């Protein structure tokens, strides 16, 4: 009996210690969506910088909804790929225990994208070319904000098209194959993304503005992050990529077999920029 009481006491002490010490401030959990080029690139760069400062960084791969929910619960510290006001606006509104740290990119855009040889310029013209496009819009993951927006485009423009959802990688592969065959194709696309540097593409005009205007990419954190990690919060408030630096980063990352090493090289190449973020 005394042995059992002793074991129970030890367990209570351990539980109390865990409650009082809280989370390890040197371990940072950052959410990331695999296949989303800009998010992967920014996350890998941030990971390199934080690790050089002595932090241990754990990347948690999940969907945007799961990452935001995990941040709201305090299990994930950061997410660098929140698109506002349209793409993730309704998602962010569901979670009261997260906070914005800063804007990392100002010129983001969502839309329906076609190869430049396709001879239409606006979404409303899709109606007249159902045969050429096989009545399909090639989309990405079902949980993505752009997926919901494309569904609304089909309704607003009264298109008789099927929205095909699979993955970002599958969408890009189908786009590449169509371009090789000079076949007409329309996909859910966005900038920044390396595909605009590697392929000749154009956005279709969206006169109804269903897909919105320019978006900003925001960095969000769990609600108490700024209080617990003021130095890191200050750093993330300064992280910013202009169009040139983002294009360079995405170009370097695309096709890289070791994104961590590529991120290290990019950080070294842009040392002055990174120093400014850390001041």
Each predicted region: which residue ranges?
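C-terminal motif of bacterial Sec signal peptides marking the signal peptidase cleavage site
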Residues: 15-18
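Short, well-ordered beta-strand elements
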Residues: 24-38, 55-60, 134-138, 236
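An extracytoplasmic/periplasmic, membrane-proximal ligand-sensing/linker region
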Residues: 28, 38-41, 149-161, 165-182, ...
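Short helix-initiation/N-cap motifs at beta->coil->alpha
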Residues: 34-37, 58-72, 163-174
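Ligand-binding cleft/hinge of the Venus flytrap
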Residues: 45-53, 128-164, 268-269
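A ligand-binding cleft/hinge motif common to bilobed small-molecule-binding domains
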Residues: 80-94, 177-202
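A conserved helix-loop-strand patch within extracytoplasmic ligand-binding domains
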Residues: 97-146
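A bilobed periplasmic-binding-protein/Venus flytrap-type ligand-binding module shared by bacterial periplasmic
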Residues: 109-119, 215-229
């Amino acid at each position: 009996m005394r042995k059992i009481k002793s074991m129970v006491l030890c367990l209570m002490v351990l539980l109390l210690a865990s409650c009082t010490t809280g989370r390890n401030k040197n371990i940072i959990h950052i959410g990331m969506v695999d296949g989303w080029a800009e998010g992967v690139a920014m996350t890998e760069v941030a990971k390199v910088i934080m690790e050089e400062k002595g932090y241990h960084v754990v990347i948690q791969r999940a969907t945007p909804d799961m990452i935001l929910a995990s941040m709201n619960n305090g299990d994930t510290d950061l997410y660098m790929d929140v698109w506002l006001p349209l793409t993730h606006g309704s998602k962010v509104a569901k979670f009261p225990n997260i906070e914005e740290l800063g804007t990392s990119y100002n010129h983001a855009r969502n839309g329906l994208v076609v190869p430049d040889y396709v001879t239409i310029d606006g979404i409303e013209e899709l109606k007249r070319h159902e045969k050429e496009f096989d009545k399909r819009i090639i989309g990405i993951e079902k949980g993505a904000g752009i997926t919901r927006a494309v569904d609304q485009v089909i309704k607003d423009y009264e298109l008789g098209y099927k929205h095909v959802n699979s993955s970002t990688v599958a969408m890009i592969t189908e786009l590449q194959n169509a371009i090789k065959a000079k076949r007409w194709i329309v996909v859910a696309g966005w900038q920044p993304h390396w595909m605009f540097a590697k392929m000749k593409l154009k956005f279709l005009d969206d006169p109804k503005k269903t897909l919105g205007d320019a978006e900003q990419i925001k960095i969000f954190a769990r609600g108490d992050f700024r209080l617990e990690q003021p130095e890191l919060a200050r750093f993330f408030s300064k992280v910013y990529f202009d169009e040139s630096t983002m294009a360079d980063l995405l170009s370097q990352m695309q096709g890289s077999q070791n994104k961590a090493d590529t991120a290290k090289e990019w950080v070294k190449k842009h040392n002055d920029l990174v120093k400014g973020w850390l001041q």
